From Swiss-Prot:
GO terms for biological process: coenzyme A biosynthetic process. Homohexamer. Pathway: Cofactor biosynthesis; coenzyme A biosynthesis; CoA from (R)-pantothenate: step 4/5. ATP binds at residues 9-10, 17, 89-91, 99, 123-129. One of its GO terms (cellular component) is cytoplasm. InterPro entries: Cyt_trans-like (IPR004821), PPAT (IPR001980), Rossmann-like_a/b/a_fold (IPR014729). It comes from Renibacterium salmoninarum (strain ATCC 33209 / DSM 20767 / JCM 11484 / NBRC 15589 / NCIMB 2235). The gene is coaD. Substrate binds at residues 9, 41, 74, 88. Signal peptide: none annotated. This is Phosphopantetheine adenylyltransferase.
Length: 160
């Protein structure tokens, strides 16, 4: 079985993530969407909420497993899960410059390869940070995020 890992904090998951994950699902028998937590970052959504939004959004795709990644090295996580590849979406040359050293280290640590998928043009500008900023300032992000995320944004406004 060809298994890959798509890692990300997914805070929140957006249509650019979905596009990369769907393409990865076409390349591999199983894709583990590993939802990560960096304790140095401040998150809008809890890990549980991010897992729920990803699960709801990706339910129609075959071969997708969604789970928390936990602490530790991505290369070691891939080895433990039997994944031969890491799939990363690339929006720009700066993404590539950032990802290549990590891909090289991951390959040297455990032999896991990194597959880079260029983002579709309509998603080149998307980032979770930008989506949170636009939404927080009252902008309409409905073209950029799945319904599960929109619902969470609206629920957050109702409780504030």
């Amino acid at each position: 079985m060809r298994r890959a890992v798509c890692p990300g904090s997914l805070d929140p998951i957006h249509n650019g993530h979905l596009e990369v994950i769907a393409r990865a699902a076409g390349l591999f028998d199983e894709v583990i969407v590993a939802v990560s937590t960096n304790y140095a970052k401040k998150y809008r959504f809890s890990l549980e909420e991010r897992l729920e939004m990803a699960s709801e959004t990706l339910a129609s795709l075959r071969g997708i497993v969604i789970e928390p990644m936990g602490a530790g090295l991505l290369a070691e996580y891939c080895r433990q899960r039997g994944a031969s590849a890491i799939v990363k979406g690339i929006r720009s040359s700066s993404d590539f410059d950032y990802e290549v050293p990590m891909a090289t280290m991951n390959r040297q640590l455990t032999g896991v390869e990194t597959v880079f998928l260029p983002a579709e043009a309509r998603y080149l500008h998307l980032s979770s940070t930008m989506i949170k900023e636009v939404e927080g300032l009252g902008g309409d992000v409905s073209d950029y995020v799945p319904r599960a995320v929109l619902r969470r944004f609206h629920e957050g406004k109702e409780t504030n």
